[in-house]
Amino acid sequence: MANDGSLSDRIDALEMRLSYQDETIETLNQTVTAQWKQIDTLTRQIAALSERLQQAESSVATPANERPPHY
């Protein structure tokens, strides 16, 4: 029965492909998880920098309220 050998070979090939796909999915999952952690860190850093910028801008006197130095 040559057909049985062919079927067995096809099943083996599918099992190998499935194994490689599982490995690829796990690698991609790890990559996406690491990227989300990095995105979360960067988002927090941007929020902190934005707050610092707002504080710095509010502490600077506006030029309309100051007299020029030659007065």
Swiss-Prot record:
Pfam families assigned to the protein according to its UniProt record, in alphabetical order: SlyX
InterPro entries found in the cross-reference section: SlyX
Family stated for the protein in its record: Belongs to the SlyX family.
Protein's recorded name: Protein SlyX homolog
Species the sequence originates in: Rhodopseudomonas palustris (strain BisB5)
Gene: slyX
